[in-house]
A protein has these predicted regions:
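Conserved small/polar residues in nucleotide/adenosyl-binding loops
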Residues: 1-5, 125-127
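Aromatic/basic-lined ligand-recognition segments
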Residues: 4-62
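Charged/polar, solvent-exposed surface patches and flexible loops
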Residues: 5, 19, 72-75, 79, ...
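Flexible helix-coil linker/hinge segments at domain or subdomain boundaries
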Residues: 8-13, 82-118
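Short, exposed beta-strand "edge-strand" segments with a Pro/Gly-rich flavor and a Y/T-containing core
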Residues: 60-65, 94
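An acidic, glycine-/histidine-flanked metal-binding catalytic module
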Residues: 66-89
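C-terminal helix/juxtamembrane-tail motif
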Residues: 119-124
């Protein structure tokens, strides 16, 4: 998925992402990526924190008090989890940002994406 679009959705600057939600780096094989993520010394300030054995923490997003932003963020993370569980490693690697968004059906998330010009598809929701 396009890093620029994920950065815009996260409401963080590149510097904030590097400090609070760093990436583990890219490995060629998803199994190597998971092993590296679980066994690295990166600490908890990574985009997906796997430090605790029974917890997965998504740290990409800035905090918010706005209900529509919170709702859209939770819906995006839910969709991300659904996609990750239902697709093969190769399908995930081949997926674009727009392929990912095409499967979204939650009207609040669609509206949020449209308002921020992250996705435009007028057939999905009628304003």
């Amino acid at each position: 998925m396009c890093i620029r679009d994920r950065l815009r959705f996260s409401r963080r600057t590149q510097g904030q992402l590097n400090r609070w939600a760093a990436r583990y780096g890219m490995k060629l094989n998803p199994k190597d990526q998971m092993y590296h993520a679980k066994n690295s010394c990166a600490g908890r300030y990574t985009a997906v924190n796997l430090t605790n054995a029974d917890t997965v923490e998504i740290r990409l997003f800035r905090g918010t008090l706005k209900l529509n932003t919170l709702t859209a963020t939770l819906q995006l993370v839910n969709h991300l989890c659904e996609v990750a569980v239902s697709m093969s490693d190769q399908e995930l690697q081949d997926m674009s940002w727009f392929d990912f968004l095409d499967q979204i059906t939650e009207p609040e998330l669609i509206q949020y994406l449209k308002e921020r010009r992250l996705y435009v598809n007028l057939s999905l929701i009628h304003i």
